[in-house]
């Protein structure tokens, strides 16, 4: 009786533990974010999907609580299992099949258990429990059963009762066996994922410990460069530290003013009066520390009273409150200041020269500026005759290739005052947010002069900056440039000038070898305030390509050479759109539209959408950190594929596969934009809708055009239920001259609830897809493009020197209206992303690359077919904008 009672007690406890495990799976399950646009292309492929476990990890049987503890397999069965594993090919899923394939054949009076849910005494002889008890018999699931359950598990790790019942009937199993198999499979997957995360966290912890020890040792060995003694603060108070910092800052400011006074205020043979620190700078080599105004953009806090200038023995240890930047990186940046103290006055003189040239270029007309198809293009020879640069670089670039110049000018009215615009131009992070589709990277290397006496950046500010500008296609290389940015205020005219000029001789060691080398000639904008809070902006863009450029696809040769890809028109169109967007974000008289109830929820939704746009633009361009691969050797192939391993928040963790293609279409960019921005028309494209319809549940207007908006769409799919609703976040944006964007990403209901509640949405994972459309003339007026299964082929002249800027449909200057010919087509960039594997260390399967390539090609063909149908059978003839 005692033995039987003990057996019952063990069985009941195991049943309770199994129930707990099931509830834990329900609580802690983390399904991958679905992607409706690509939901069908992986499943339709004949290739096997990704396995999320490596061979080495799959052979380790995890120790599961409550489920694995009761599994006892006889020695002969273990040998059979090992032989089956060896014959299975060694894949991770095959090993898991071996672990999950045991099931018992019981009599009709006992419940069945599958795999790891067997009672602990199941393998004991029947005589130990009773004389007439039958001995349990175990068997493995068949290969077909395992394959079917694995297939369902990859689609739905948590099947409901109907799915389990249907599967059990198809496989000849009992529903309880299917239920237990799925429980064990989920438990093993969670254990493997936890183990991998634990290894990563341990490695990161060790790295942080080693960095901490190294920095502590470096602090203990710090030596003052002025006196050579150890720099120790001892028991110095916080107030004394601040006083020392302020005192050193004032000394340096006095030295700077003394240098300026000796240059411009003195005369004759009078000797300049210099302070002791200034004399030490002349007689001794420059110190290893950064000058006081030589601060990294990520370090300074817009108030220079908090920054550490020239430091003495007691000032080398930073104050207790450190700005948001890594201390070691700031210290290294201080030792590598490109512009030393003795060179600063030269840079200030160059800034004044560049500002004068910019003002003259903004006022000049012909022959400096000539109109070509509605755009103002610089006459390079006339510019060289009118303007000279004191530190002019050689006209011969790398390899003896002649530098090619691009110069354009445009003007526009934006809905933002000059103060806010100047503040955005002088802050690298705000500058990137203001131009998300063209500035992919930007940082301030050094602050030469802060300008304003109050400590804020303003008139007279002089910065050394580094930026990387992009075009939304991997077929056009990004351009990296190091330049000085100077801000000056003209009080008489009430205008501000933001002028950039080349950093000749100061960019050594700052440029990457993987991007196009450029020299930014005096360029920039003049901002004039208007009475109604608007600003009129005149923009001049002048870039010079140095060395031999990479060959471009025929579809881009004339477009890039004319300056349309990186010219003033594109910069101004993006500025107009972002100013409209920021103005709508600050508006508070917005009616309740959909599920967005509060202004805070509206602001959070716009921030989430802005991050989606920025992520999409960065992931489809040819920035210096991404390597793109062509799928064929044909020079006409326009599809490029890349992969990246992501572990940072904000995007799904794992291996992300991206495919991008750019094609020229014989339709206006507004026609293509209307097709792709309208969710109802887009649902007609089978490759993009996946058979489901969309219903708008929230709408945020953020521009003057009706299509400039953010939408939250409900995906009406057959898989939806009351507990599982798929949502789509979409933002569409258009400008008559600068082109259009349509970007969308799937989000779950929980993420939207977090956004609506006012919490930080920066950690919500987004994997955006979308389209970029730019107005462009045909690459070859004599030949129409043809679209093949994988690319758009064109015939161009190939000289790369003609100027065929896409004309402007609306301009403030209508004197040459007869030259404003409408564009006869557009450039369409299609960008697709898919989470290939949730494990960052997984290997990419070639079948997945083939599948996403086919998906992009089919999308282009369906878009072209839909546009031809809407044009009334006009074939490849472009439609008019009128």
Swiss-Prot record:
The protein, known as: Homeobox-leucine zipper protein ROC3
UniProt subcellular location: Nucleus
DNA-binding region location: 134-193
One Pfam family it belongs to: START
Job description of the protein: Probable transcription factor.
A molecular function (GO) term: DNA binding
S-S bridge residues: none
Keywords of this entry: Coiled coil, DNA-binding, Homeobox, Nucleus, Transcription, Transcription regulation
Record's signal peptide: none
Coiled-coil intervals: 200-263
Keyword Ribosomal protein: no
Source organism: Oryza sativa subsp. indica (Rice)
Biased composition (Basic and acidic residues): 107-119
């Amino acid at each position: 009786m005692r033995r039987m009672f003990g057996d019952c007690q063990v069985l009941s406890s195991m049943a309770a533990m199994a129930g707990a495990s099931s509830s834990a799976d329900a609580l802690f399950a983390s399904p991958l974010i679905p992607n409706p646009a690509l939901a069908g292309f992986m499943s339709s492929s004949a290739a096997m999907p990704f396995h999320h476990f490596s061979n080495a990890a799959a052979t380790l049987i995890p120790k599961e609580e409550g489920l694995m503890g009761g599994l006892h397999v006889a020695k002969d069965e273990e040998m059979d299992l090992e032989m089956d594993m060896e014959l299975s090919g060694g894949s991770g899923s095959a090993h898991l099949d071996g672990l999950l394939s045991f099931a018992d054949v019981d009599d009709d009076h006992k419940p069945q258990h599958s795999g790891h849910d067997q009672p602990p005494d199941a393998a004991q002889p029947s005589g130990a429990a009773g004389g007439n008890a039958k001995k349990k018999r175990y068997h493995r699931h068949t290969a077909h059963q395992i394959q079917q359950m694995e297939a369902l598990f990859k689609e739905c790790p948590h099947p409901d009762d109907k799915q389990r019942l249907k599967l059990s009937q198809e496989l000849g199993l009992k529903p309880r066996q299917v239920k237990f198999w799925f429980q064990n499979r989920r438990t093993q997957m969670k254990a493997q994922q936890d183990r991998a995360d634990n290894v990563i966290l341990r490695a990161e912890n060790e790295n942080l410990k080693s960095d901490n020890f190294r920095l502590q040792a470096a602090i203990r060995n710090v030596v003052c460069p002025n006196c050579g003694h150890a720099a120790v603060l001892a028991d110095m108070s916080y107030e004394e530290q601040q006083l020392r910092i302020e005192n050193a800052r004032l000394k340096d400011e006095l030295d700077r003013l003394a240098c300026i006074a000796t240059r411009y205020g003195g005369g004759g043979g009078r000797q300049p009066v210099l302070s002791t620190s200034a004399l030490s700078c002349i007689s001794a080599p420059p110190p290893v520390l950064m000058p006081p105004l030589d601060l990294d953009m990520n370090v300074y806090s817009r108030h220079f009273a908090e920054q550490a200038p020239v430091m003495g023995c007691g000032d080398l240890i930073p104050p207790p409150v450190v700005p948001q930047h890594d201390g070691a990186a700031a210290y290294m940046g201080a030792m590598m200041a490109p512009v030393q103290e003795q060179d600063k006055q030269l840079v200030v003189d160059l800034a004044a020269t560049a500002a004068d040239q910019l003002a003259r270029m903004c006022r000049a007309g012909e022959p400096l500026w000539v109109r070509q198809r509605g755009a103002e293009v610089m006459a390079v020879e006339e510019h060289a005759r009118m303007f000279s640069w004191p530190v002019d670089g050689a006209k011969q670039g790398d390899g003896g290739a002649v530098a090619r110049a691009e110069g354009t000018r445009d003007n526009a009215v934006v809905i933002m005052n000059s103060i806010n615009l100047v503040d955005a131009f002088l802050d690298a992070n705000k500058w990137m947010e203001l131009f998300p589709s063209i500035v992919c990277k930007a940082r301030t290397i050094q602050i030469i002069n802060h300008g304003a006496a109050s400590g804020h950046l303003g008139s007279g500010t002089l910065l050394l900056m580094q930026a990387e500008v992009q075009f939304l296609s991997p077929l056009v290389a990004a351009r990296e440039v190091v330049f000085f940015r100077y801000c000056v205020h003209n009080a008489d005219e009430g205008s501000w000038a933001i002028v950039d000029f080349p950093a000749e001789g100061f960019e050594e060691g700052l440029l990457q070898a993987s991007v196009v080398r450029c020299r930014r000639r005096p360029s920039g904008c003049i901002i004039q305030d208007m009475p109604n809070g608007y600003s009129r902006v005149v923009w001049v863009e002048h870039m010079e390509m140095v060395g031999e450029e990479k060959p471009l696809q025929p579809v881009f040769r004339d477009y890039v050479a004319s300056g349309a890809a990186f010219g003033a028109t594109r910069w101004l169109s993006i500025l107009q759109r972002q100013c409209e967007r920021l103005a709508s974000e600050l508006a508070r008289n917005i009616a309740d539209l959909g599920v967005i109830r509060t202004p805070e929820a509206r602001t959070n939704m716009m921030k989430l959408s802005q991050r989606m746009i920025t992520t999409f633009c960065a992931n489809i361009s040819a920035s210096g950190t991404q390597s793109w691969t062509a799928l064929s050797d044909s020079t006409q192939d326009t599809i490029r594929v890349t992969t990246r391993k992501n572990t940072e928040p904000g995007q799904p963790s794992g291996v992300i596969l991206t495919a991008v293609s750019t094609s020229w279409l014989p339709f206006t960019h507004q026609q293509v934009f209307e097709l792709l921005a309208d969710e109802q028309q887009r649902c007609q494209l089978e490759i993009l809708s996946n058979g489901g319809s969309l219903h708008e549940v929230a709408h945020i207007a953020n521009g003057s055009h009706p299509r400039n908006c953010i939408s939250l769409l409900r995906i009406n799919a057959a898989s939806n239920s009351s507990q599982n609703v798929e949502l789509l976040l979409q933002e569409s944006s258009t400008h008559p001259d600068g082109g259009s964007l349509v970007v969308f990403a799937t989000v779950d209901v929980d993420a939207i609830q977090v956004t609506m509640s006012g919490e930080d949405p920066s950690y919500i994972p987004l994997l955006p897809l979308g389209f970029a459309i730019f107005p462009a003339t045909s690459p070859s007026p004599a030949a129409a493009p043809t679209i093949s299964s994988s690319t758009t082929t064109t015939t161009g002249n190939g000289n790369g020197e003609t100027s065929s800027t896409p004309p402007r449909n609306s301009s403030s200057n209508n004197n040459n209206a007869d030259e404003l010919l409408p564009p006869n087509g557009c450039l369409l960039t299609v960008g697709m992303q898919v989470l290939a594997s949730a494990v960052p260390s997984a290997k990419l399967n070639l079948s997945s690359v083939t599948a996403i390539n086919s998906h992009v090609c089919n999308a282009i063909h369906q878009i072209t077919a839909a546009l031809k149908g809407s044009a009334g059978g006009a074939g490849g003839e472009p439609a008019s904008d009128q």
